[in-house]
A protein has these predicted regions:
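Conserved acetyl-CoA-binding loop-helix of GNAT-fold acetyltransferases
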Residues: 97-110, 114, 133-137
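Helix-loop element at the rim of GNAT/NAT acetyltransferase active sites that forms part
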Residues: 18-35
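Acetyl-CoA-dependent GNAT
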Residues: 24, 36-93, 105-106, 165-167
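Active-site acidic-Proline motif in GNAT/NAT acetyltransferases
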Residues: 89-94, 98, 126-127
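A short beta-loop-alpha structural element at the N-terminal edge
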Residues: 4-18
Length: 214
């Protein structure tokens, strides 16, 4: 069965609520449980409208037949933090290991690059090895750990804080240009460098103590 990835629409609100109840019951890695997000279709419609009207926010759904089996969103920030966005993702347990998470994350990163987002932030349970491995594969870096980030059945759960710096390619380009400039200078000064080296070797040879003849 083909998986279809597309942006959220207001008419998806009821399906989204069903999906959050499903995934909430399947894992403790989310901020909600089997109750789902607890909103009505009307509230979710307004939520989707707000996302779709924000040029720096997006929500993607992965569809299998007529059901949502994956969800990811980029939430743009405002004013002096408008270069940043928060990221969240979930996938139905039946689809774990099928690559849906990678496709959704790739879509969100592409959206961020196309819409002027330079930094993507996320948080994830520190023991969620599967998710952390996925994020690292796409270049996310751990920048800290927050203790007692969530509390489930009386147990405190730590979270890793991670980010993806989309400026990295431009930084690497600048580093490469600087390296090329240094190489050009080195080539221009090669004759002088070789001369100095020969002079140093000659001086060392001149002052070298010769073994006495028997």
């Amino acid at each position: 069965v083909d998986i279809i990835i597309r942006e959220a629409r207001t008419e998806d609100a009821a399906k989204l609520i069903e999906y959050t109840k499903l995934v909430g019951a399947q894992t403790d890695n989310l901020s909600f449980g089997k109750e789902g997000i607890g909103d009505t279709p009307e509230v979710e419609k307004e939520f989707i409208k707000r996302i779709n009207s924000d040029p720096k926010s997006v929500m993607y759904f992965a569809w299998k037949n007529d059901d949502i089996v994956g969800c990811a969103n980029i939430s743009g920030m405002k004013r002096r933090m408008s270069h940043r966005a928060n990221f969240a993702i979930s996938v139905a347990k039946s689809e774990w290991g099928c690559g849906i998470g990678s496709v959704l994350l790739e879509k969100c990163i592409s959206f961020a690059k196309d819409n002027g987002i330079e930094i993507i932030n996320l948080d994830t349970r520190s023991d969620n090895i599967r998710a952390i491995s996925l994020y690292k594969k796409f270049g996310f870096v751990k920048i800290g750990r927050m203790p007692a980030f969530s509390k489930i059945n009386g147990e405190y759960i730590d979270a890793d804080l991670m980010y993806l710096d989309l400026r990295e390619k431009s930084n690497n380009r600048r580093k490469m240009e600087a390296f090329e400039r240094l190489e050009a200078i080195r080539r221009e000064n090669k004759d002088e460098v070789d001369f100095n080296k020969e002079r140093e070797e000659a001086i060392n040879k001149k002052h070298q103590i010769q073994p006495q003849s028997q």
